Amino acid sequence: MTTHLVWFRQDLRLHDNLALAAACRNSSARVLALYIATPRQWATHNMSPRQAELINAQLNGLQIALAEKGIPLLFREVDDFVASVEIVKQVCAENSVTHLFYNYQYEVNERARDVEVERALRNVVCEGFDDSVILPPGAVMTGNHEMYKVFTPFKNAWLKRLREGMPECVAAPKVRSSGSIEPAPSITLNYPRQSFDTAHFPVEEKAAIAQLRQFCQNGAGEYEQQRDFPAVEGTSRLSASLATGGLSPRQCLHRLLAEQPQALDGGAGSVWLNELIWREFYRHLITYHPSLCKHRPFIAWTDRVQWQSNPAHLQVWQEGKTGYPIVDAAMRQLNSTGWMHNRLRMITASFLVKDLLIDWREGERYFMSQLIDGDLAANNGGWQWAASTGTDAAPYFRIFNPTTQGEKFDHEGEFIRQWLPELRDVPGKVVHEPWKWAQKAGVTLDYPQPIVEHKEARVQTLAAYEAARKGK
C-alpha cells in the first residue's frame, strides 16, 4: 500500500498548503500527518510564549480539521531539530511510509535538518515545496544570476516574473475514501504559553481567511494613507497568521488582487503588495546569505562598531521607561499584546541602536521573545535595516529623532496616552515632551526624564559608525 506522510511545520492550515495537496492527490493512498514540537530549539530561537499559544491553538484546530478529512495527525515532542530527524525516520518505519511531503523552511538550522532527514530516508521518496513564498528563491535573480541586494530592483524583477506566471492557490483536500475519523486527544505544547487577543490574531483558519478578506476589501486601498499612524487601525494584523502558516502569501496575493486589481500596476493596494514583496525579499536573502541566520551583519564593517554594554539602558528600553513617550508607548504595546505597529518597530529599533548605541542583536532577540508574529527573516531584516548593517538598509547617518517621530505620527498623542497612563493628563501635543510641560505647570509626573539627550547621542553614534567604517 502507498502511504503518504505530510510533515507540518510552519504551515498550519488546510487551504493552499502545497505539501498537503500533493500528498492527497493520489486518492488511493493512505495519508498521515506529523507535527514535531521542539521546545529546546524554540527556546534557542527565542520563540515568544504568545506565539507558542497561537501554535498550540492552531495545532488543535488543524488536528480536528484533518480528522474530518480522514487524516490522523501524529504529534511528537523532542528537544531539537537534530532529534527530530530520528522521529521522522521512526514514524516512516512504523507506518511503512513510501512518500514524505513537506514545505521548505529557509532558515539555516531548518535546512540542515531537512538535508539530514532526506539522507536518513533512503527508501522513502521525499518531496519539498516552496510554500511560504509566492516566488521561490532563485526565481528572481540579477543578470549575473546573483541574489539582488537592493529592494527596488528586486521588486521590479519580482513583479515582472509574477506577470509571466502567477502561482495559483490549491484547494483544501477532500475527505479521504476511508471517511472521517475521531481526532486524537488535545495537544498541549511543553513550552511557556501566554494568552493573546484572538479578535486581532484569529486562531481558526476560517477566521484568518475572513480577516484577510475584510482587510483587502476595506483596508488595503487606504493602507498607504493610514499605515504610519499607530492610533489608527490601518494595518492588516495578518503577520501572525503568516508567521505560523495559518495563511499563505499566495492567499494574500490573490485576495488582494481580487479586491484591488490595480495593485499590481501601482494603484490602490500596491503599498500593501510592497509589504508582501519585502517579506519575499528577506526570505530570499536568508537562503542565499545563511550567515544572516547566525547573527552576522550583511555589511561586514558594521561588525566593528563599538557597542555600549549598558544593561540598565537595555532594561528601561525593554520596559518602556526611557523618557521618550513614543518609544515607551510602543514598547508597552509590545509587552502587553505581543505585537507592535510597524512604524513603531522602526522608531524603537532606531532608538536602541542609534540613541543608546546598544547592539542591534539585543533588540532582535528581545523582539523575537515577545512578538506573536516573530519571524526570523523579517525580524532580522527589520533590525538590520534600522541599524544600517543590512542590505539596502537606512544609511548609518539616518537617525530618527524620537520626539519628532512622535509628533509626526501620533500628533495629538492619542496612542501615547493609550499606553502611558501616567501621561493621560498631559494636554495636547506637549505630551511628546512632558518634562517641559511639567516644569512650566509646576507638576510632578510619575514618568522618567529622558535617559539620553538625543542630539548628544546622535553625535556619539555617528562617531562610532565612522570609526568602524574607517577600520579604527
Residue ranges of predicted features:
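Active-site-proximal binding-pocket segments
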Residues: 233-422
